[in-house]
Regions:
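Extracytoplasmic/periplasmic, Sec-exported soluble proteins
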Residues: 130, 134, 155, 182, ...
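Structured beta-strand-rich core segments of catalytic domains in phosphoester-bond hydrolases
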Residues: 33, 80-108, 139, 149-241, ...
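N-terminal post-signal-peptidase region of extra-cytosolic proteins
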Residues: 131-137, 176-179, 202-204, 212-214, ...
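N-terminal, active-site-proximal structural segment of metallo-dependent hydrolase catalytic domains
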Residues: 2-166, 182-186, 273, 366
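Short, solvent-exposed loop/turn segments at secondary-structure junctions
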Residues: 116-119, 157, 197-200, 233-236, ...
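Active-site beta-strand/loop signature of hydrolases that rely on acidic residues for catalysis
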Residues: 110-116, 134-163, 194, 217, ...
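Acidic/histidine-rich helix-loop elements
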Residues: 113-133, 237-265
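Metal-dependent phosphoester-hydrolase catalytic domains
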Residues: 4, 15-30, 35-70, 74-80, ...
């Protein structure tokens, strides 16, 4: 009998040590994600991957905390301490619904930022429906928002010589500024900014060895001049279906290629962000930063571009802020960042399925 008790006690001891090691590992990884935004991925790209895991690691630690509390284990302190700093960051991913916003006392500005995915979503998801139908649906939605400024990424047109006439037809009363990369067959893709405000200045920031870029436009509204950066930073360029096929076929080359693409993207993106940030620093007027960052709110990209700015979702959003449709609600990679002295009074991420991204719509009090 005594021997059985000793064996049982030994089993519990091993289980207790194993569970504490698991808690320490999960807590340690979560703590590293807090520092991921401070480390330039160009120098240590692995930190960026851990930043992507902030939400899953937070959930793992929460489950471990509840499990430890249920077992009346003193080890609950481990996940609890790891989770405490997350209270400062979780609002970047989800916001508790609040009462109606305080009415604006000053003039407002409405901005839409939307990665339209080259208008190819219908072709991928609904056979028989093409780019034209997808584009018409997207522009109908944008017109319904009645925005002052529209920032589009991955805009595509089949004839580069017809860009202005096409946009005039879709968005009457708006002036378009754009930079497009030509592709074989006469088509082109890139960034487009549309506005009905008086244009004061414009420019572009091209990134080395990349088909991504940022364009900027200066406007004046209600006696205030400001700049809008429309950014599309380096993407991972990976295919989830391709990864799954490689997994089922046990094809190691797929994973090797995916890893190379991720590393290339992660190391290029901070350089692009630094280029834009340098331009912002020299800008004589206050700046909005909009677009597809291809990075999460625990990233170096977000942390860098947030300096001197506020996040429209954090200030006025409700529910989950995720913008990448296929991994909802995990990935929030599209943003509208506004100058500190302005105020976001509305933020919306309509879940419309015209792209693999959802649009971001914000109303700003100037």
């Amino acid at each position: 009998m005594a021997k059985k008790k000793r064996n049982r006690g030994k089993g519990k001891g091993i289980f207790g040590v194993t569970s504490r090691m698991l808690m320490l590992a999960a807590a340690g990884l979560l703590m590293v994600t807090y520092g991921s935004m401070l480390v330039n991925p160009a120098k240590a790209w692995g930190f960026s991957l851990l930043g992507l895991l902030f939400v899953p690691l937070s959930l793992v630690n929460l489950v471990l905390l509840l499990w430890a509390v249920k077992r009346l284990s003193r080890s609950f302190v481990i996940p609890l301490l790891a989770l405490l700093p997350s209270l400062f960051f979780i609002g970047r991913y989800v916001q508790i619904p609040s009462d109606d916003p305080t009415p604006a006392k000053n003039p407002t500005l409405k901005i839409v930022s939307y990665n339209v995915g080259r208008f190819a979503f219908h072709e991928n998801e609904s056979p028989g429906a093409g780019r034209r139908q997808c584009a018409d649906s997207i522009f109908a939605f944008i017109r319904s928002c009645d925005p002052d400024i529209v920032c589009l990424q991955e805009f595509r047109i089949s004839d580069i010589n017809k860009v202005r006439s096409y946009l005039r037809g879709q968005m009457r009363g708006y002036k378009a500024e754009f930079y497009l990369f030509p592709t074989p067959g006469g088509s082109a893709f890139g960034n487009v900014t549309l506005s009905r405000l008086p244009l004061k200045s414009k420019g572009k920031i091209k990134f080395e060895e990349s088909a991504n870029l940022a364009i900027y436009t200066d406007y004046e509204a209600h006696g205030r001049r400001f700049r809008v950066y429309n950014c599309h930073f380096e993407s991972y360029n990976i295919s989830l279906p391709g990864i799954l096929r490689g997994l089922f076929r046990a094809d190691r080359s797929v994973f090797s290629e995916t890893g190379s693409k991720m590393k290339r993207s992660i190391t290029r993106r901070p350089k692009q962000v630094d280029q834009v940030f340098s331009d912002i620093e020299s800008c004589p007027v206050e700046s909005f930063v909009c677009g597809d960052f291809n990075d999460n709110p625990m990233s170096y990209s977000y942390y860098r571009l947030m300096r001197g700015r506020k996040d429209s979702f954090v200030e006025a959003g409700q529910g989950f802020g995720a913008t990448f449709a296929r991994l909802w609600p995990l990935l929030r990679i599209d943003y509208i960042l506004l100058p500190d002295r302005f105020r976001a009074i509305e933020h919306d991420t309509p879940q419309i399925r015209f792209s693999d991204h959802y649009p971001v719509v914000a109303t700003i009090e100037l």
